[in-house]
Amino acid sequence: CTSRTDLPHISPREVHISYLPLAHIFETVVMNFCLFRGAAVGFYQGDTLKILDDLQALRPTIFVSVPRLYNRIHDKIVGGARAKGGLAGKLFFKALDAKLQRLHATGSGEHRLYDALIFSKVRRQLGLDRCAKMLCGSAPIAADVKDFLRVAIGAQFIEGYGLTETSAAATICHPDDVTNFHVGMPALCCELKLQDVSEMGYSSAADPPSGEVCVRGPCVFGGYYKMEVTRDYPRL
């Protein structure tokens, strides 16, 4: 936890909902970091089909998920607005367009009128009315979904890249960075370099650079369990 100071600021007032598998490094690191900072952690019922009930009961300030679930949230909100149709549906999409334009122009999607009239209700229905930080990892997320969540939920959306061997994030986006198509800067606890792979045509001198991503630092694991037995196994 002491090496993960690059993670977003988390205070003892924060509330995190833990529902992703703890066998995966992403949730394990986030949960332990929250406890390390004195934040509260609530656990879901064990049924992902009831996650909405859990969110409404806990009202977390931090929400950590993967693109698949974020896509479902996006589809649920947009689908609900389309199903309403009429004036309510038109007003929703007008408000959404206005907030997206403001996000791209200023870096903030806040709009007092539309937030009060429309999006505050959406957030309460999802149990995310207190959510200030949304973290995403494990796979790329579409830029339009990310921007939608920024304006609909009104939270910082922070994406990262890493793996089990790097204790989750090896790179992480700055909380105030609203640009897309990247996974941020190297985490403070590690160094990254691109290693040329000539047989695959990867070169760090190319434009744009490419290569095998190599990571070193205190967040990198020491080795695999029973290394002497498994050293001849294929590595990812």
Explain the meaning of each model-derived region.
Residues C1-V15, L22-A116, A152:
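Conserved AMP-binding/adenylation subdomain of ANL enzymes
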Residues V15-I17, C214:
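Short, well-ordered beta-strand segments
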Residues Y19-H24, S138-P140:
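Conserved AMP-binding
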Residues Y114-L236:
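Conserved AMP-binding/adenylate-forming
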